[in-house]
Amino acid sequence: MKFVDEATIKVDAGDGGNGTVSFWREKFVAKGGPDGGDGGDGGDVYLEADENLNTLIDYRFNRFYDAERGKNGGGTNSTGRRGEDITLKVPVGTRAIDIDTGEKVAELMAHGMKIMVAKGGWHGLGNTRFKSSVNRAPRQKTMGTKGEVRELRLELLLLADVGMLGLPNAGKSTFIRAVSAAKPKVADYPFTTLIPSLGVVRARGNKSFVIADIPGLIEGAAEGAGLGVRFLKHLERCRVLLHVIDILPIDGSDPVQNALTIIDELERYSEKVAGKPRWLLFNKTDLLLEAEADEKIAEILEALAWEGAHFKIAAVSRTGTQEVCNELSDFMDTLPKEIMTDEEKAALKVDFMWDDYHKDAMSGKNVVTEDGDDDDDWDDEEDDGHVIYARD
């Protein structure tokens, strides 16, 4: 199946049903009084994470999703039926962004997690609600509110423990092929990898972790150059970043400048991502004599003023790759589990202030008065039943 990690959809929650103006009429009961019921609430729209899905491709073909409208109220104080909700299944790791406001509406990080993204309209009030000692036959009602309409950008963030980054042709795909069963395309030209790939890595002690191969970055990626931020986002949930540096680039470029380009793009994209633990992997060391490779690596480390973890590998021959995996596994055991901040939790909440509508309604705002005969014109000879005043 084609990997699709972005889609744009429009969700339309159901409108609330209108309240009804109705009066009970019964033989020998001249003035039965109001019995208009409330409408039903409109249906809501939810996103739910499903571990059986791994792409957003379905939402490329169907972009519009509507919840059901609430039914209008009826006579005999009958409340209208609530509109049916709709639930859209998405892969685990999906987040939803409101295109108009840029607000993060939802981020679904676990199977079964369910978040409302559009609230249905509130029900209108029937005329029974307006009965009082001075208004015995009210013809007032309120209309249901409109359901929320949102245009959402769905983004699928790969859930990996380790993310690989580097310039095109640095050897990221070769490394992931060497340490896992993943088989991303490998060739001797830039941008061979056009979509992210995931691989499961086995480490010592019967441990395992997931590694993500991210398409190569170029200068300006944080602003969308090349494959841009579309794939930088996949690093947000990684616990460790592996920065692959080609010590002998085929185009003759400077490895130090290449490394600085990646570092700069990370910092421009997100301070949080740039602050994640990052290890350097010096690749293609088999193209030089061991002493030459060591000297080259030392020069790069000095130029970068790098004091963090670094490894010398030759991914094509798998030299040093298993050592990296074992060290990664041990290192991640020491990392604390990520805990969402209060600010991040607040960003996931969707607040709807619908109670104000009913307060306004009962105070005289948003009220519709139906036309009808005078209150006293009740005919005792009418058949049993009730009269509903309705306006189309």
Swiss-Prot record:
Residue span, OBG-type G domain: 160-333
Residue ranges constituting the Obg domain according to the UniProt record: 1-159
Gene Ontology MF: a single term: GTP binding
PROSITE patterns: G_OBG, GTP1_OBG, OBG
Protein name: GTPase Obg
EC code: 3.6.5.-
Binding partners and assembly: Monomer.
Requisite cofactors: Mg(2+)
SUPFAM superfamilies attached to this UniProt entry: Obg GTP-binding protein N-terminal domain (SSF82051), P-loop containing nucleoside triphosphate hydrolases (SSF52540)
